């Protein structure tokens, strides 16, 4: 089963770009900033597991 999640958005409403695919410390930090524990780089954007629709950008 796929784990639900979302692409977090920055304060300008943009996704977080990343270059190192898969496990990515930068994305991990971004996801923690958004209140979830785990995420990784997918299709050059940070993806956070279990992140709700991200309306409250940080």
Curated annotation (Swiss-Prot):
Q: Where in the cell is it found?
A: Secreted
The cysteines covalently paired via disulfide bonds are 18-41, 27-46, 31-48
Give the UniProt tissue specificity note: Expressed by the venom gland.
GO terms assigned for molecular function: sodium channel inhibitor activity; toxin activity
Q: Which residues form the LCN-type CS-alpha/beta domain?
A: 3-58
Q: Which CDD domains match?
A: neurotoxins_LC_scorpion (cd23106)
User: What UniProt keywords apply to this chain's record, in alphabetical order?
Assistant: Disulfide bond, Ion channel impairing toxin, Neurotoxin, Secreted, Toxin, Voltage-gated sodium channel impairing toxin
The superkingdom of the source organism is Eukaryota
The function of this protein is: Beta toxins bind voltage-independently at site-4 of sodium channels (Nav) and shift the voltage of activation toward more negative potentials thereby affecting sodium channel activation and promoting spontaneous and repetitive firing. Moderately toxic, but very high abundant. Does not target reptilian channels. Does not produce effect when administered to blowfly and cabbage looper larvae. In mice, produces convulsions, tremors, increased ventilation and, subsequently, death.
- Record's family? Belongs to the long (3 C-C) scorpion toxin superfamily. Sodium channel inhibitor family. Beta subfamily.
Q: What is known of its domains?
A: Has the structural arrangement of an alpha-helix connected to antiparallel beta-sheets by disulfide bonds (CS-alpha/beta).
Q: What is this protein called?
A: Birtoxin
The organism is Parabuthus transvaalicus
């Amino acid at each position: 089963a796929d784990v639900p999640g979302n692409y977090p958005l920055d304060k300008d409403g943009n996704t977080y770009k990343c270059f190192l695919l898969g496990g990515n410390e930068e994305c991990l930090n971004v996801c923690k900033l958004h209140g979830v524990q785990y995420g990784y780089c997918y299709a050059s954007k940070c993806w956070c597991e279990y992140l709700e629709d991200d309306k409250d950008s940080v």
